[in-house]
Amino acid sequence: MSSGMHVALVTGGNKGIGLAIVRDLCRLFSGDVVLTARDVARGQAAVQQLQAEGLSPRFHQLDIDDLQSIRALRDFLRKEYGGLDVLVNNAGIAFKVADPTPFHIQAEVTMKTNFFGTRDVCTELLPLIKPQGRVVNVSSIMSVRALKSCSPELQQKFRSETITEEELVGLMNKFVEDTKKGVHQKEGWPSSAYGVTKIGVTVLSRIHARKLSEQRKGDRILLNACCPGWVRTDMAGPKATKSPEEGAETPVYLALLPPDAEGPHGQFVSEKRVEQW
């Protein structure tokens, strides 16, 4: 495998929106597409399913909660391709509405994967992104709703153009601590743990886009957060309005922005349109 070969990678690619994104990239992206999943058997089964459709993704194990797993993937990409052209951070979790797990545990578990896991992937893989690369962080419209339910003080912090990654990490940790103390509502947080983790993903995207513009100005890398919509998946359930294929549309659009595109960059995108944050 030569370092001249283009490569796209999708996290959480074995089912739902992730699998639909992999399928589209296999059809539309000129290069290799790597499907990653936490569970090797499920990931390989997804690859076989796509092979039966005449597509040929590669598989690599990735558990975004496990730093060693992330670093093994990083080393694989560096060795096989000399970097990465497209990264779609899709892996994430949500508790069902009726789940009896105590709220503070839901908050901690969801935050660990959706925010901190995604952040760890970015820390390890963003330095590998090649010039004209594309990074897509799958967030949610729930992040916009959760933001509107935050106190004005928190809203101001999350909308700040100068918030640092360290400050954001501090706020995400504070949310989890506040839920443990049972004071999260008094402290101005909304009642959706999932929504807060996705605020984290959207704001992290804004921070990373800003850093790329400052540190790699001429490389024309575009990084955005997006909402796939309300999609029929294991996570959202059967009543959702969109198919996984429809949910993949905006993430794939952002992953395949043409080389000469100036934007969007550092935006929250829904239905292929930039939404106000």
Swiss-Prot record:
Principal location class:
cytoplasm
Residues that the record marks as modified (N-acetylserine) are S2
- Does the record carry Transmembrane helix as a key word? no
Q: Which residues carry this modification: N6-1-carboxyethyl lysine?
A: K239
Q: Does the keyword Oxidoreductase apply?
A: yes
State its Enzyme Commission number(s).
1.1.1.184, 1.1.1.196, 1.1.1.197, 1.1.1.71
- Catalytic activity field: a secondary alcohol + NADP(+) = a ketone + NADPH + H(+); prostaglandin F2alpha + NADP(+) = prostaglandin E2 + NADPH + H(+); prostaglandin E1 + NADP(+) = 15-oxoprostaglandin E1 + NADPH + H(+); menadione + NADPH + H(+) = menadiol + NADP(+)
User: Record-annotated residues binding glutathione?
Assistant: F95, K96, V97, Q106, A193, Y194
Binding sites annotated in the UniProt record for substrate: S140
Q: Which UniProt keywords apply?
A: Acetylation, Cytoplasm, Lipid metabolism, NADP, Oxidoreductase, Phosphoprotein
Q: Where is the catalytic site?
A: Y194
Task: Supply the InterPro entries for this chain.
Answer: CBR1-like (IPR045313), NAD(P)-bd_dom_sf (IPR036291), Sc_DH/Rdtase_CS (IPR020904), SDR_fam (IPR002347)
What residues does NADP(+) bind to? 10-34, 63-64, 90, 194-198, 231-233
The subcellular location is: Cytoplasm
One annotated GO molecular function: S-nitrosoglutathione reductase (NADPH) activity
Could you give a single Gene Ontology term from the biological process aspect?
Answer: lipid metabolic process
Residue list for modification Phosphoserine = S2, S30
Q: Which family does it belong to?
A: Belongs to the short-chain dehydrogenases/reductases (SDR) family.
Provide the assembly information: Monomer.
Q: What does this protein do?
A: NADPH-dependent reductase with broad substrate specificity. Catalyzes the reduction of a wide variety of carbonyl compounds including quinones, prostaglandins, menadione, plus various xenobiotics. Catalyzes the reduction of the antitumor anthracyclines doxorubicin and daunorubicin to the cardiotoxic compounds doxorubicinol and daunorubicinol. Can convert prostaglandin E to prostaglandin F2-alpha. Can bind glutathione, which explains its higher affinity for glutathione-conjugated substrates. Catalyzes the reduction of S-nitrosoglutathione.
Instruction: Supply the name of the protein.
Output: Carbonyl reductase [NADPH] 1
This protein's species is Pongo abelii (Sumatran orangutan)
